[in-house]
């Protein structure tokens, strides 16, 4: 194995390093990140290029289907994923959120079974957010995260076992531009995974758990194979057995839905199941088929979990997971309490209850909430309908899902001016906050993250591209979209504090809603606005 000094050659950091961050950005940890980068970055780039080739095929009319070359994997009933790891047997309610210190304490104090600490869609990847998030998780694992903010004290509970920690690194498409290795920015995925794993894997094992991850945005089983290769290298490097890591894969792209068996197969000894990432799944469906008029969807509020293509995806995910002995996790309840309107709050919470009931009855092994106040509703539903720790025994052998079911876009509903304005509000509201370094934004009593903003701008793009007509009889074209964008921007900016970023957000948004240019991801489009690269420091000088 190459020495730390050798591995650090060619590694530079251009983000400021504060004293409390030095325990994370150590030469040893960065040399491990460098090893991951040099081992896997070329494969990562090849896989991203493969995504572009696949998009070109879809644009030509080659629709996704189950892969003939992996039919033997799908049809072999004998192989299984890993048995549930310590702390992951019962996952009936999981809370998700960014990794700021207050959120980490509040999440771990919630009445939930696991906490997904998020470096991805609910975090804006400023250098400070990413590195401080690592500091906060390091401290939380060691039970040394208590702190004061003004008069308020934040302390971890000591009256019970804390929820199991699961970390979501950034997706394969994102880079961490503040760290370069041999002149290239490091992958955000490998940076987030590498630092967390290096510092905490052995500590977590000693505490009776393990390094557990949620893996986002994958589009094929080959991308899962890359994670598995990274897991094997990492475990060998620190000297813990292969199979100690667990990864739950978010099925949040339409292409991954056709490769769920294969994704579990690639991660076999590291698999802890799949999750229904509903908003990103809708975004991915619009994005992949954006050039096909037969895939135009109505207002976002019409695209519920019970429409044909969403219902098919849920059923197939549960069936696939349980056939392979791994968890099938339900999706996000994004609602947040409405404190000043009891009737509206009761209606919103009833919607949460109905959604969680649908999931429990469908066979899910657990579900997500974005706010601690929703945990009790989700728990009540799952405790009643799932008295066992999970439902892995519910094989759903009644389910028969084919290509046409996953691509069935018969979604009732219409496109309205209100729907357009809602999409503009959500997109602008989220992008403005993201540019300010905030990745999780309450808008109209829903906790919006990057996925919901992606749905908003993709729908607008699609509606303009195909010249749809609203329920009010108005044709949606470029000038109409830009007119409404200006109106919504002016309204939001006038109500916001001075120094807000709504006009800057609108400049970016305007490029995405005319049916012409289409950025792969909003977060990639905006990333340069939040980078703070300064003087480069060779990592060997740390």
UniProtKB/Swiss-Prot annotation:
Keywords: Glyoxylate bypass, Glyoxysome, Peroxisome, Transferase, Tricarboxylic acid cycle. GO terms for molecular function: malate synthase activity. InterPro entries: Malate_synth_C_sf, Malate_synth_sf, Malate_synthA, Malate_synthase_CS, Malate_synthase_TIM, MS_C, MS_N, MS_N_TIM-barrel_dom. The keyword Flavoprotein does not apply. It is an enzyme of class 2 (transferase). It holds the Pfam family MS_C. The active site is at residues 168, 449. It is found in: Glyoxysome. GO terms for cellular component: cytoplasm; glyoxysome; peroxisomal matrix. It comes from the Eukaryota. Pathway: Carbohydrate metabolism; glyoxylate cycle; (S)-malate from isocitrate: step 2/2. One of its GO terms (biological process) is tricarboxylic acid cycle. It catalyses: glyoxylate + acetyl-CoA + H2O = (S)-malate + CoA + H(+). A motif (Microbody targeting signal) lies at residues 540-542. Its EC number is 2.3.3.9. CDD domains: malate_synt_A (cd00727). The keyword Zinc-finger does not apply. Its main location: other. Belongs to the malate synthase family. This is Malate synthase, glyoxysomal. It comes from Neurospora crassa (strain ATCC 24698 / 74-OR23-1A / CBS 708.71 / DSM 1257 / FGSC 987).
